[in-house]
Amino acid sequence: EAMKTTPSIEKCIVLERTKKTISMKNGRDVWWHDEMLKVTSNCPIEIMDAEAPLFILYTSGSTGKPKGIQHSTAGYMIYTEYSFRNVFQYNEGDIYWCTADIGWITGHSYIVYGPLLAGATTMMFEGVPSYPDAGRFWQIVEENKVNIFYTAPTAIRSLEAKGMDFVKPYDLSSLK
């Protein structure tokens, strides 16, 4: 819907996930799987100015209209890599998992930029921590042998309200 009223969008990469009919616009929309066939393992570095825009992320608008916050390349990347290494004490071989929403600055910083700049193994999760039951986070920790787990206190409190029986079946010994 949004792209119908935004003619400035030149390309849209579409990933098929649900097997539902997808309305594609010729010349603009391309399939992810087709584009991936064109990719090589060689990815030359693009030299950027330190103050070049890296991305714009919009605020929630909780105090009014959402505002686009532009983050610069060097400052943001240096900060997220440094804070990731020092706050989470990541070591090579660790499996790190931040449960934040990737559309928020915490998700951007500690799912994508910080871990990848540090060469870390980072996990992404799509869904809610209570589906199919309140043991979902702990199931993922066990299955993937997560060492470092970062989530919000509100998430833990909401799961805690469901009781500790959802935690007990899982082996959490991989956590530091």
Where in the sequence are the language-model features?
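Conserved pre-ATP/AMP-binding loop-to-beta segment of ANL
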Residues: 9-15, 19-20, 24-58, 65, ...
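Conserved AMP-binding/adenylation subdomain of ANL enzymes
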Residues: 77-95, 105-148, 161-164
